[in-house]
């Protein structure tokens, strides 16, 4: 798969409110693939760029269910099928004794799923990211706010998107090479 030579167009803003307003306007204009970078969390920004965070809880739920089932079935197999021991006349399949390990396996698998699911869904580890090619982007961790429209967006047009971002009155606009 050939990479697009341009990753997107990035606009730099002076304040968090200007970034939120620009993100709102950009999203309302029909751009779907946008992202924002700021030196601190900005309230309301995630909603304005159309961020939805519903994948990780589902991954954790599936991991927890798999962990609980595997813990329970492992104990059932060992005590009732593989090596049945009649101890004090108790049944081989004594489910109350299985609760603790089943619970622990549920928590273990859910926790591992949360960590690896978050890493996978965030595309990590990522030692290289195209936004680092923009010289002014180093200010994103200090005092500047950036909004990028990705070239993979359906509405993206190099000239039209640049003109649209210029109308938002940013401090500067940069093309982000891949």
What residue ranges belong to the model's regions?
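Membrane-helix interface motif
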Residues: 75-84
């Amino acid at each position: 798969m050939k990479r697009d030579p341009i990753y997107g167009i990035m606009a730099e803003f002076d304040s968090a409110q200007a970034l939120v307003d620009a993100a709102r306007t950009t999203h309302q204009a029909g751009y779907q693939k946008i992202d924002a970078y700021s030196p601190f969390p900005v309230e309301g920004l995630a909603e304005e760029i159309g961020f939805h965070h519903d994948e990780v809880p589902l991954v954790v739920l599936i991991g927890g269910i798999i962990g609980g089932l595997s813990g329970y079935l492992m104990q059932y197999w060992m005590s009732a099928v593989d090596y049945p021991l009649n101890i004090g006349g108790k049944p081989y399949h004594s489910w109350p004794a299985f609760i603790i390990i089943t619970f622990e396996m549920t928590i273990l698998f859910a926790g591992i799923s949360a960590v690896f699911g978050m890493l996978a869904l965030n595309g990590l580890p990522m030692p290289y990211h195209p936004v680092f090619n923009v010289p002014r982007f180093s200010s994103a961790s200090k005092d500047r706010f950036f909004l990028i429209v990705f070239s993979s967006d359906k509405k993206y047009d190099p000239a039209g998107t640049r003109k649209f971002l210029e109308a938002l009155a940013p401090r500067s606009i940069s093309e982000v090479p891949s």
